[in-house]
């Protein structure tokens, strides 16, 4: 097939989509704005509901990137239609003509301080699950 496909977002969904596209004969170009691939999963220690280590899911994915062009610390500068393809320009100065664009941009965590009634940001012992995961992952005890 040898057609380029841009995958925007380098979390687990973007990585897996890129791997599947590669296996189908496409040339995936994976673009992630963060300094590393993995998204939120890279920050977490354990996964609900079984408590499996996040690294046991993510690490094998990251070790299977052969044939995938990927860029970190990179954003999409522009996307323009050109007949039956797209021209995608990246913030690193590169551009690619692609057959398709796949959005796998993930999610942002809820800003808990917006709900004052929960006490987050007011009482030091009120934390979010994301805070707890950071502590578990780092091995550091909360202050």
Report each predicted region and the residues it spans.
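Residues forming the flavin
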Residues: 1-143
């Amino acid at each position: 097939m040898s057609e380029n496909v841009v995958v925007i977002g380098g979390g687990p969904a973007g990585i897996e989509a890129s791997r599947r596209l590669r296996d189908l004969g496409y040339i995936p170009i994976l673009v992630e704005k963060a300094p590393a691939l993995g998204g939120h999963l890279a920050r977490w220690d354990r996964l609900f509901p079984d408590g499996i280590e996040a690294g046991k899911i993510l690490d094998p994915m990251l070790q299977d990137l052969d044939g995938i062009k990927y860029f970190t610390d990179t954003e999409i500068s522009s996307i323009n239609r050109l007949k039956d393809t797209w021209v995608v320009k990246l913030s690193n100065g590169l551009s690619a003509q692609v057959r398709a664009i796949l959005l796998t941009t993930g999610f942002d965590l809820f800003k808990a301080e917006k709900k004052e009634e929960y006490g987050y940001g007011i009482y030091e012992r009120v934390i979010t699950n994301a805070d707890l995961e950071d502590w578990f992952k780092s091995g550091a005890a909360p202050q």
